[in-house]
């Protein structure tokens, strides 16, 4: 009964995007319906002075498409020297070609697989050798590269869990550790792209949730350690932007589902049945097609984290529905929040 009362009002909330933020000291602000946290991001002015951009160097991972692609172009337009890490640069990906077509000495695409220590170290050397004064370091690192998958625990192979973690979690750790010496010299910024699913769990998304919860914890630990050294660490937690990031298409969802079903142990297929399996896939298709196609709230959040004198600890670019749902999941007792999923 309570789950129904909660879910129906949530579904009627307008689809406007928010950017509710915790301040740098990590203190929670009251989350009231009348607070400024409910101002849509398109109308909200971040209350913080801006650092001069100059020609500060920033590295963004995962720039082949999605957030990273848009970020690279936007930060370049703001005057940054941008190193755009692209997984598919060596394969001539269309996104890489478009970035290269800008023909700017302030935007350089680099081959970068965040799972490869060798490629990461090569990029460290490329960045260091490109800086006017390496001793002054590099201003910003945006850990954006990520992959996603879906499937209930019994439907998901252990190998899939490892693959998602290698990119989303260990890729973030690997990149951060490799670039921290340059970031520390500049007293710069680390911005980690997490997700609302790094704050609240979701059925059929455990591989992704695990990694994003890990990114949240890693970011908090790093922020505590770096604060005395003048480095500021922020986390951006986007809502549902799947439709804007090309993570899934109807075809890719069906291909993943087909492979998943075929590889399931016979006992799992027998116990759950194809009807149950297909219903879960249909829910995933609906979720993927219902998200926002406008990435600007995320781009604005990352830009603020890189340029503000006092950047926020966390940014929440998401619509009202997901913002309120996250507050319920993270602030109310588990016995209540569980009712959203357990009926």
Swiss-Prot record:
Pfam families: adh_short (PF00106). Its EC number is 1.1.1.30. The modification Phosphoserine is found at residue 246. This is D-beta-hydroxybutyrate dehydrogenase, mitochondrial. GO terms for molecular function: 3-hydroxybutyrate dehydrogenase activity. Residues 1-46 form a transit peptide. SUPFAM superfamilies: NAD(P)-binding Rossmann-fold domains. Substrate binds at residue 195. Keywords: Acetylation, Allosteric enzyme, Glycoprotein, Lipid metabolism, Membrane, Mitochondrion, Mitochondrion inner membrane, NAD, Oxidoreductase, Phosphoprotein, Transit peptide. One of its GO terms (biological process) is steroid metabolic process. It is an enzyme of class 1 (oxidoreductase). NAD(+) binds at residues 59-83. Belongs to the short-chain dehydrogenases/reductases (SDR) family. Homotetramer. The modification N6-acetyllysine is found at residues 73, 97, 132, 177, 212, 258-259, 280. It is found in: Mitochondrion inner membrane; Mitochondrion matrix. One of its GO terms (cellular component) is matrix side of mitochondrial inner membrane. The keyword Lipid metabolism applies. The modification N6-succinyllysine is found at residue 259. Glycans are attached at residue 219. InterPro entries: NAD(P)-bd_dom_sf, Sc_DH/Rdtase_CS, SDR_fam. It catalyses: (R)-3-hydroxybutanoate + NAD(+) = acetoacetate + NADH + H(+). The active site is at residue 208. Requires phosphatidylcholine as an allosteric activator for enzymatic activity.
């Amino acid at each position: 009964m309570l789950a129904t009362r909660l879910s129906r009002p949530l579904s009627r909330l307008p689809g406007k995007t928010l950017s509710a933020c915790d301040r740098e000291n990590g203190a929670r602000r009251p989350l009231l319906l009348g607070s400024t946290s409910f101002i849509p991001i398109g109308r909200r002015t971040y209350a913080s002075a801006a650092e001069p951009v100059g020609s500060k160097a920033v590295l963004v991972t995962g720039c082949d498409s999605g957030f990273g692609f848009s970020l690279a172009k936007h930060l370049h337009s703001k005057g940054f020297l941008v190193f755009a890490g692209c997984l598919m640069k060596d394969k001539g990906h269309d996104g890489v070609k478009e970035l290269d077509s800008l023909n700017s000495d302030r935007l350089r695409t680099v081959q970068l697989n965040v799972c490869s220590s060798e490629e990461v170290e090569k990029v460290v050397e490329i960045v260091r050798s490109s800086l006017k004064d390496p001793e002054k370091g590099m201003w910003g690192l945006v850990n954006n590269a990520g992959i996603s998958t879906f499937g209930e625990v019994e439907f998901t192979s252990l190998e899939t869990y490892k693959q998602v973690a290698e990119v989303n979690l260990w890729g973030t750790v690997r990149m951060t550790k490799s670039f921290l010496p340059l970031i520390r010299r500049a007293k710069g910024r680390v911005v980690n792209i997490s997700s609302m699913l790094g704050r609240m769990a979701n059925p059929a998304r455990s591989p992704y949730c695990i990694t994003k919860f890990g990114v949240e914890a890693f970011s908090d630990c790093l922020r505590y350690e770096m604060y005395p050294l003048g480095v500021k660490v922020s986390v951006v937690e986007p809502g549902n932007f799947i439709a804007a990031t090309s993570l899934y298409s109807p075809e890719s969802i069906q291909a993943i589902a087909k492979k998943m079903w075929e590889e399931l142990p016979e006992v799992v297929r027998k116990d759950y049945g194809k009807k149950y399996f297909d219903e879960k896939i249909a829910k995933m298709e609906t979720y993927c097609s219902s998200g926002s196609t406008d990435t600007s709230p995320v781009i604005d959040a990352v830009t603020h984290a890189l340029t503000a004198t006092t950047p926020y600890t966390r940014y929440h670019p998401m619509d009202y529905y997901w913002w309120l749902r996250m507050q319920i999941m993270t602030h109310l007792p588990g016995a209540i929040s569980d009712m959203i999923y357990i009926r």
